[in-house]
């Protein structure tokens, strides 16, 4: 009798998969951060990037939740961005206790400059990674991210 193979990955395979994703993230973030202009850190760029792709304004709490960091860590990042003139932090018009954060035109310009500064890194990756492989992997990674994102919110 032949044993039926499971289509489910083993725990060891999943551990190795997520370990590889983690190492890739560390490597790319280190390279990416070296290319960022004007002393911008990856966490600061990530907040500016969030504003460019998700919403024009948010509370510090919403940002902390989106980035899965403590409110204190997000406040620290926002203070640094504000001191550089990249975000504006104002009182919320509906609540005296809450604040709203938005990207400034200077922040938008630096975000574009940062994206452009990473172009050589992206171009190098494009030369060394076949498009078909990237597209297949991207689809799978998006499914994993969506699954993990749903679990985070439940």
Regions found by a protein language model. Name each.
Residues 13, 36, 43-44, 106, ...:
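N-terminal positioning helix adjacent to the helix-turn-helix/winged-helix DNA-binding module
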Residues 1-38:
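N-terminal leader segment of winged-helix/HTH proteins
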Residues 19, 46-50, 75-77:
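Base-recognition residues in the alpha-helical recognition helix of bacterial helix-turn-helix
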Residues 113-154:
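Terminal interaction helix/tail motif
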Residues 55-108:
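Canonical helix-turn-helix DNA-binding module
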Residues 30-70:
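N-terminal helix-turn-helix DNA-binding core of bacterial DNA-binding proteins
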Residues 37-41, 73-76, 80, 130:
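Short glycine/proline-centered loop/turn elements that form peptide/ligand docking sites
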């Amino acid at each position: 009798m032949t044993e039926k193979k499971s289509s489910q990955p083993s725990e060891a395979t999943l551990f190795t998969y997520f370990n590889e994703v983690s190492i890739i993230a560390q490597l790319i973030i280190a390279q990416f951060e070296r290319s960022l202009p004007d002393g911008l850190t990856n966490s600061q760029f990530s907040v500016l990037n969030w504003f460019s792709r998700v919403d024009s304004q948010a509370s510090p709490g919403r940002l902390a939740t989106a980035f899965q960091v403590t409110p204190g860590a997000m406040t620290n990042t926002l203070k640094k961005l504000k001191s550089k003139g990249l975000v504006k932090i104002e009182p919320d018009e509906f609540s005296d206790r809450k604040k709203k954060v938005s990207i400034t035109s200077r922040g938008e310009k630096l975000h574009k400059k940062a994206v452009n500064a990473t172009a050589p890194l992206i171009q190098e990756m494009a030369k060394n990674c076949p498009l078909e492989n990237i597209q297949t992997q991207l689809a799978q990674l998006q499914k994993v991210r969506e699954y993990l994102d749903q679990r985070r919110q439940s």
